[in-house]
Structures are given as structure tokens and as C-alpha cells.
Amino acid sequence: LKGGANHVYMSGPQPGGSDGTAGIFLLYEYPAGGTGATKYADGNHVVRAFPEGDFNVVQAAEIAEMQCPVRIEQYGLRDDSCGDGEYRGGCGMRRDVRILSDSASLSVLADHAVIPPFGVAGGYSGDANRFVVIRDGKTIQPSPVPGKVGDFALLKGDIVRMESSG
């Protein structure tokens, strides 16, 4: 029904404490995607599947910023990520997370990062999931395999951009 399973993990030393650290932080993000259109209506934007339980679509920025050394710089719909057709699919989301700790790591396990969710019944495919790091204004692919990232080293000031499929 939606763009695919997305699991994004950012972790590293939590600033504070007598030795400069107060343990380890872990920010688990699960950027939701849009649903496909039906024969009679547009799809829904940024939806979690019902069998996944009572999750928010994404964590509130205020909670993430209180618990982890990050700043949410952007959160909104990923414009035009939905599949076109007589009725359009729902849009995915875009979320930019700036790392405020001296170091951190990024891991991603996601589907539909190469082959986007396909359209059916005359509808067109939505955009594929995309996960990149922005460092000093340059976009970095954190892995040669899109959607599969293991322990990519993040630096203070890096922005992790998550763009879910429509």
C-alpha cells in the first residue's frame, strides 16, 4: 500500500557528563511514504500501514531534539513525489536532521530506493526513496547501494536528508 519499509538510525555520543559524554544517543526514524491512488480518489500523503501498530507517522521534532543532539531543519511533504495518473498517488515526506554532536553514525535499511513503487491501473510510479548526507553544502551518497547504509561516519554539522517515496 505504501512506498516501502524505511528504517533510519543515527547514533553517537550524547554530549554532557563529567567526561564530556552522557552515554549514547539513538534516533530511530521511520519516514513514511504515500499510498497509491484508487480508481476514484487521490492517494494519501505520508501514511504508516495499519498492521504496524499505533505509531506516529514520524517523531515530533521537539521530542527528537530534546532527547538527541540533533536539530530538525526541515519536515514536510516531498513535492511531486507521487505517481501521476487520472488520480495522483500520495506524496512522501522530506526530513532534514542536522547532527549537533562531534560524531555520530548513520545506518539505513529501506526498500524502493532503486526501483520506485510502481503504478497500477494506468497510474505512474512515484519517486524512489532517497537517503543522502549533506556535508559542507555537498551531497554525499552514504553507500554504493541505495537504501542500504551501514555505520556511515557523520560529522558535526552534517545533515541527514530522508526523502520517502510517493
Predicted segments, located by residue:
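Glycine/proline-enriched, intrinsically flexible loops and inter-domain linkers
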Residues: 1-166
